[in-house]
């Protein structure tokens, strides 16, 4: 599959997206489904397509994405990160534009672990004065 394909791996929260990109008509496939079908929410679709819109390449590439882990928001972010890396692999001249928009940087925020003696990461048990 790698022949004339450019690839990039994107990560966000606990999601990992492997993105394969080649010149084409603008068809985006996520896990074998059309992007509209896979991501139900319009915001998730918009987030995933941001690097293409920024570089005016919405109709220029066919993209195949394999994404797993996490939820819809994390998968959309991982897809955006993967598409960004694949675009840079295709044309390194796009890196400054994508970097300026903040798409090249991996969003390092993760879920904070639950602590012993607390209800969640920071929430303590309810305090009773009497």
Curated annotation (Swiss-Prot):
GO terms for biological process: translation. It comes from the Bacteria. GO terms for cellular component: cytosolic small ribosomal subunit. SUPFAM superfamilies: Ribosomal protein S5 domain 2-like (SSF54211). Belongs to the universal ribosomal protein uS9 family. HAMAP family: Ribosomal_uS9_B. This is Small ribosomal subunit protein uS9. It comes from Delftia acidovorans (strain DSM 14801 / SPH-1). The gene is rpsI.
